[in-house]
Amino acid sequence: MSKRSLSSLGAEDLCGKRVLVRVDFNVPLGDEGLITDDTRIRAALPTINDLLDKSARVILSAHFGRPKGQVNETMRLTAVAQRLSELLGKTVVKTESCIGAEAKSKVDAMSNGDVVLLENVRFISGEEKNDTEFAKELASLAEVYVNDAFGAAHRAHASTEGVTKFLSPCVAGYLMEKELKYLQGAIDQPQSPLAAIVGGSKVSSKIGVLESLIDKCDKIIVGGGMIFTFYKARGLSVGNSLVEEDKLELASALEKKAQEKGVEFLLPTDVVLADNFSPDANSKLSKVDAISEGWMGLDIGSESVELFQNALKDCKTVIWNGPMGVFEFEKFANGTNAIANTLAELSAQGCCTIIGGGDSVAAVEKAGLAKKMSHISTGGGASLELLEGKVLPGVSALDDA
């Protein structure tokens, strides 16, 4: 699905134009109300700076938290406006509401190269309902639309989908374009062999991804808590490990489907067991067919790491979504860290490594390896849905290339 990008618009198209840019500024805040990680704000800078270079009037729209359609003083974008001003080296004017007379007057007062940040769009109930009247009023502030919020592209909300009916052209920003290039590209036209590493605690949250990837991958590597549902489906004893009893048949069906398609479907051969779920639990290594009663698996073992490393050796594209174990506990982070290091080494050898959102991004960042990967996705749910082969409303609403 090829979409028109901001790069197709020159200064002659944008000079003096009011451009509504949907960004993803849903950043973490600390106790003092200060931003603890500004990655998402920085990720939007290429798009914002390009518009400023082309003398546009930049109107930014963003959500923060889940205020449920009401004003929540702790969810205002004040800290974001301040940080963005520092990063851009210029004043960013923030509105008190994203629509209404005050927002309109601040937009009307803009000169070329100015930046206005509209207040949290989710303060208005019409945002998440994709209300046409709200979308129309939001769109009336601008003439051109740019969506650079990949992390919100799986939502059909007023600021991601509704506004496109009232603005033209509607194009993808540079972050959105990069996300689609890597994630969509890896699925539609991968350099093969293509491997997917799927982790996380529950099969249920990754069913769609696994089903979709079995059709596209040469190899699938499964780790994290969900492995125990597969083991139990095979008739193995899993002790106190996490199991989704209602997904046993599905686990068997997924393995069978992979086998029928000739896809290498790899599960760990050994696991690190713990006697309780805590960072200082007693631990021991065990083969998967000898898991002790009363113990639970919290990481993959060293033999499994080697098995997975060998399987990945010849791959040209690797997508990773979900950790191998409870990496938040140092004792059970080895499997996840080993995979992160392996992918960093593969990247250096020319393999395209894509970290597909969520906890695996946190794991790679914690290991200090983020810069060594080909692409780190900024979208959690959006990445997952794209990997599932779903159409993202915020993307399909943009102009075709």
Curated annotation (Swiss-Prot):
Which reactions are catalysed by this chain? Answer: (2R)-3-phosphoglycerate + ATP = (2R)-3-phospho-glyceroyl phosphate + ADP
Is this entry keyworded Cytoplasm? yes
State a single Gene Ontology molecular function. ADP binding
Q: Which positions bind substrate?
A: 24-26, 40, 63-66, 122, 155
List the InterPro entries: Phosphoglycerate_kinase, Phosphoglycerate_kinase_CS, Phosphoglycerate_kinase_N, Phosphoglycerate_kinase_sf
**Keyword field:** ATP-binding, Cytoplasm, Glycolysis, Kinase, Nucleotide-binding, Transferase
Instruction: Name the domain of life this protein comes from.
Output: Bacteria
Question: What's its top-level EC category?
Answer: transferase
Q: List the disulfide bonds.
A: none
Any single biological process term in GO: glycolytic process
- Pathway(s): Carbohydrate degradation; glycolysis; pyruvate from D-glyceraldehyde 3-phosphate: step 2/5
Q: Which GO terms describe its cellular component?
A: cytosol
Q: What EC numbers are recorded for this enzyme?
A: 2.7.2.3
Q: Which residues bind ATP?
A: 206, 297, 328, 357-360
Localization annotation:
Cytoplasm
Q: What coarse category fits the chief subcellular location reported for this protein?
A: cytoplasm
Similarity comment: family membership: Belongs to the phosphoglycerate kinase family.
Q: What quaternary structure, including any partners, is listed in this protein's UniProt entry?
A: Monomer.
Q: Name the HAMAP family for this protein.
A: Phosphoglyc_kinase
**Annotated protein name in UniProt:** Phosphoglycerate kinase
